[in-house]
Structure formats: structure tokens, C-alpha cells
């Protein structure tokens, strides 16, 4: 199902002049010693990028969507993706894929419109609607910062505040991520490299005493653990590309602790309600899939049709 996903985030030299996030720029240390933390109840919902290399747009939608700037709204994945191609280091726009750095530069210079002004379809020819540029001008980030990949406490500290942005080298074993979402590091590295991919870092947990980072993917709810997966910190540090660590975006609207807590509780309830609905839908789809598999006269063809319609672009 996932082998046809486009993996085309290009590898670029690391810019040692990128600004690093400093400890004092993220206020509180409360929570960094937690065994497990996840922003999946706060982030925009899992979607499926479909057949084009728009993972930078989709992961950016999750990252920027988990800020006060877009509270109650959703950024346009297509805008982030297309503007990234304008501001990345590669000439022209007649290609699929871009870089997080290009997308960040686009967010600083041109902002990002709401999803309704450039709705997502899995086509390079998707058109923005009238008013998109004017809407985007309201949503510009101030800056972006790299967090050194070995500074686990600072990454955790940043994750307690917002989702982070990163890209990595995908190996073939990734296609077979189990429902637990936990990627086997040894099997992963033993399989071949198949391309670059951008994702949103959303949390962490410890498994048998080892730190694993949590990520939201853009391949639909059937991938991994309801669209999320976990990489051992040492594996992440080995396959990370283009930056020395995950990217933290600095937005114009900063939260005080009380306001953040109010928003967090509201978003958690909204996400809980949505997830309950998604789980019901998923169970229904699994039941349909199970029934289709028992019918020998339609076999795999029916399963393929089911996968296309029920796990396609949302």
C-alpha cells in the first residue's frame, strides 16, 4: 500500500549558520522527565498526502496548525508545499518535493493561507482560490530554529510547547511499520534507503528504557499507530537529513502558561471526540476489509479498491 508513496525530500548540505534554539527561549522545564508525552490530542488530524511528494506541506500543516496563530483553523498543506518550492535552493518549480528550510522561508516571507483558500488535492496542478495571498499575509512566522539532535531535554522542552518539524532518510522496512507504531531499528537499517520524507515530531516515550520519539505521518490512519510512529532516538539521529535536529518555528503569538492550558484542554476534548469517531470509522472499514478477504471471487482486487477509497486523500 505504501511502496508507491513519493519520497523525494532531497538531501542538502547542513547549514551550520542556522540559528539554534536556546534553553531560555522555551520557558518551562515542567514535564521533561515524563516517561511518555504526546501532542496527538492537540495537532491537526492525520491526513493522506496521496500520490504527490507533498510531505513537507502536510507535516508543515501539522506543525504550524499546532500553534496559537491557527487556533481553530487549519493551514493549507498545498500552500506550504508550493511556496516551499519557490524558496528552496533548487531552480524552478517543475518538480515534485521540496525542503523544510524552503517551506520555512516561505512562511516567513509570504505566510500561509487557511486550508479553505487552497484546498488539498493530490495533484501538482491544484489551484489556489481568490483571496489566498491576502489571507496568507495574516499568518507569517517570525523565525525558525534548529534544536541539536543530541539535546534530548531541549527537544522535550520544545515539544511540551509545540510540534516540531523534521525530515529523514526512509528505508524500505518503514513500509511495514506495525500497528504499535514502533519501528525496529536493526531491521530498518538493514533494509535499503528509498528516499527522503518530512514528518511532524509530536512527542516521546520510553520502551524498555530506551527513548523513542513520536511522529505524525501523512499516509492516512492505517499507517502505524493510527497514522503515528516511533523511532528510537539513536536511529532518528542516524537517519536525520538536512538539519542538525528538528525545527522549531517561532510564531508571532506566544502563549502564557494559563492560556496555553485552556487551549490544551479544549483541543484535547475536540481531538478525543474526533478520534472516537475515527476509531468507529476504522473499525467499520476493517470489518469491510475482513469480509472482502473472505470472498474468493473478488480477492485482492476488492481489497485494493477498498484501500483506494477508504484510505485515500481526505
What do these predicted regions represent?
Residues 280-298:
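Membrane-penetrating hydrophobic segments
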Residues 2-10, 61-65, 86-216, 221-279:
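Predominantly the structural core of cysteine protease catalytic domains
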Residues 306-314:
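Juxtamembrane boundary at the C-terminal end of a transmembrane helix
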Residues 1-53, 68-90, 112-129:
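Active-site-adjacent structural segments surrounding the nucleophilic cysteine of cysteine proteases
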Residues 299-307:
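Core hydrophobic alpha-helical membrane-spanning segments
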Residues 54, 58-61:
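Long, well-ordered hydrophobic secondary-structure segments characteristic of membrane-embedded
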Amino acid at each position: 500500500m505504501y511502496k508507491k508513496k513519493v519520497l523525494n525530500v532531497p538531501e542538502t548540505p547542513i547549514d551550520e549558520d542556522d540559528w539554534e534554539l536556546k534553553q531560555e527561549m522555551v520557558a518551562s522545564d515542567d514535564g521533561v522527565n515524563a516517561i511518555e508525552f504526546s501532542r496527538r490530542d492537540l495537532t491537526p488530524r492525520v491526513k493522506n498526502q496521496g500520490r504527490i511528494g507533498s510531505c513537507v506541506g502536510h507535516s508543515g500543516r501539522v506543525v504550524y496548525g499546532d500553534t496559537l496563530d491557527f487556533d481553530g483553523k487549519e493551514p493549507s498543506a498545498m500552500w506550504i508545499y508550493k511556496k516551499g518550492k519557490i524558496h528552496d535552493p533548487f531552480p524552478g518549480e517543475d518538480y515534485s518535493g521540496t525542503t523544510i528550510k524552503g517551506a520555512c522561508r516561505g512562511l516567513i516571507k509570504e505566510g500561509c493561507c487557511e486550508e479553505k483558500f487552497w484546498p488539498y488535492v493530490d495533484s501538482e496542478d491544484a489551484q489556489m482560490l481568490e483571496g489566498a495571498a491576502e489571507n496568507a499575509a495574516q499568518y507569517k512566522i517570525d523565525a525558525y530554529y534548529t534544536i541539536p539532535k543530541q539535546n534530548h531535554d531541549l527537544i522535550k522542552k520544545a515539544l511540551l510547547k509545540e510540534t516540531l518539524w523534521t525530515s529523514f532518510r526512509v528505508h524500505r522496512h518503514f513500509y511495514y511499520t506495525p500497528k504499535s507504531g514502533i519501528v525496529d531499528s536493526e531491521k530498518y537499517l538493514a533494509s535499503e534507503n528509498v528516499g527522503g520524507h518530512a514528518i511532524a515530531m509530536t512527542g516521546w516515550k520510553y520502551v524498555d528504557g530506551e527513548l523513542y520519539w513520536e511522529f505524525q505521518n501523512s499516509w492516512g490512519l492505517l499507517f502505524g499507530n493510527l497514522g503515528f510512529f516511533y523511532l528510537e532516538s539513536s536511529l532518528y539521529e542516524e537517519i536525520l537529513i538536512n538539519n542538525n535536529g528538528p525545527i522549531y518555528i517561532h510564531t508571532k503569538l506566544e502563549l502564557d502558561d494559563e492560556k496555553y492550558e485552556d487551549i490544551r484542554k479544549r483541543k484535547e476534548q475536540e481531538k478525543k471526540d474526533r478520534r472516537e469517531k475515527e476509531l468507529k470509522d476504522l473499525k467499520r472499514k476493517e470489518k469491510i476489509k475482513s469480509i472482502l478477504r473472505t470472498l474468493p471471487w473478488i480477492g485482492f482486487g476488492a481489497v485494493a479498491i477498498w484501500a483506494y477509497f477508504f484510505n485515500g486523500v481526505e
